[in-house]
Amino acid sequence: MPTESASCSTARQTKQKRKSHSLSIRRTNSSEQERTGLPRDMLEGQDSKLPSSVRSTLLELFGQIEREFENLYIENLELRREIDTLNERLAAEGQAIDGAELSKGQLKTKASHSTSQLSQKLKTTYKASTSKIVSSFKTTTSRAACQLVKEYIGHRDGIWDVSVAKTQPVVLGTASADHTALLWSIETGKCLVKYAGHVGSVNSIKFHPSEQLALTASGDQTAHIWRYAVQLPTPQPVADTSQISGEDEVECSDKDEPDLDGDVSSDCPTIRVPLTSLKSHQGVVIAADWLVGGKQAVTASWDRTANLYDVETSELVHSLTGHDQELTHCCTHPTQRLVVTSSRDTTFRLWDFRDPSIHSVNVFQGHTDTVTSAVFTVGDNVVSGSDDRTVKVWDLKNMRSPIATIRTDSAINRINVCVGQKIIALPHDNRQVRLFDMSGVRLARLPRSSRQGHRRMVCCSAWSEDHPVCNLFTCGFDRQAIGWNINIPALLQEK
């Protein structure tokens, strides 16, 4: 997750490395070294005691092996592009190709033509590892129920959080490592307001339940409350992003992220001073949220505490201690005075403020790695996501074990639940977004290829189930937020 301003570039470089397709082949000669007792540098050095003919043969064999690796790698990339193209053509029919199986089959065929016994063994090993490069395209008919509608591009760095306003006019909010928060028109994708009051990464954004107020948390160790006033522009026809010309496909496939030569946020009004600044933490404030009613706010920090503030006076009401490591997220119940905090200590805690005289805490243990988020649903359930690649559904009345567990192939970031339909949106480190129901049944995976979808890790998801244009939003470290239209009735019918 984000650090303070000095470490934002470091986080970005770290995430960029995840997408590197460079292939580094380390030539080892352990068997030769064991037989001859000579180190590798002597085999390659000028003073090697090996005959020149033997050295030349060795170097030639190494060159052949390297070329075979390179050919396999190129073929794998070509197969991946073919799979993307075929899936887009078949998306309208609700079909998908199992890319993992296709890639393995193709690679097996191509590997069988090897004439060298040694290179054949190495190629088989390489094939097993590189088959993971191709995305897994599991057969599902739900692709037709999920459509990319709008891309919101304007941030200069990764976007950590996305949120939808609860009051009219309904706008989209994004929080970024570029030290700003932006408000967007959902229909047009135009930036309406820029908040530039923080001096560190903006790690979360949440809207007040009844007023035009936003709450942002930052790496500068503060949380800000600021007022906005927006006027929505006239909606323009939404472009169909599912149909892209072949010329555009080649152009887009070479891009790792959106082209941001022009700063679209430079033309929108900028707010630089908050109404209220909440200052009590001694570390990065990673998340913040409004308690029911909007008169109090809670913050979560890397100093291992969560703080409860009075919004009107900015006074600290409670400091919530108990986590053993940095906090990663906090969330409030929509109708009750309950707070849930997540931590790197593999637990999340439920704090109960319904009794003004005393607050109680319950600890949930069940994950084996950082709990990246835990959120409330309607009723007595909490859903938690973790870097251990699982999502767990819990009953607040029974903390001992989850009532459902979802196992995935990638770490999970800030999840969100569609309250009305009880659908969980899972944003992954591996650029995928998957939808599950509360019992753990997978409903869909959002379309993603070299031409659409996220190009780096997806950090957060947010539902807006009543919006006519987009009812799901995601954001990621590719510096863009995306609005999706999820046909929920069709999704549930296919279930």
Swiss-Prot record:
Main location: cytoplasm
Keyword ATP-binding: no
Biased composition (Basic and acidic residues): 32-47
Compartments, record wording: Cytoplasm; Nucleus
CDD domains in UniProt: WD40
Protein keywords: Cytoplasm, Nucleus, Repeat, WD repeat
Biased composition (Acidic residues): 246-264
WD repeats: 154-194, 197-236, 280-319, 322-361, 366-404, 407-446, 453-494
One GO BP: lymphocyte homeostasis
Coiled coil: none
Biased composition (Polar residues): 1-13, 22-31
Domain of life: Eukaryota
Gene3D superfamilies: YVTN repeat-like/Quinoprotein amine dehydrogenase
Keyword check for Iron-sulfur: no
Location of region: Disordered: 1-50, 237-266
GO CC terms in record: cytoplasm; nucleus
InterPro entries found in the cross-reference section: G-protein_beta_WD-40_rep (IPR020472), WD40/YVTN_repeat-like_dom_sf (IPR015943), WD40_repeat_CS (IPR019775), WD40_repeat_dom_sf (IPR036322), WD40_rpt (IPR001680)
Quaternary context: Forms homodimers. Interacts with PACS1. Interacts with PACS2.
Function according to Swiss-Prot or TrEMBL: Required for normal ER Ca2+ handling in lymphocytes. Together with PACS1, it plays an essential role in stabilizing peripheral lymphocyte populations.
Protein name: WD repeat-containing protein 37
Species of the source: Pongo abelii
Gene, per the UniProt record: WDR37
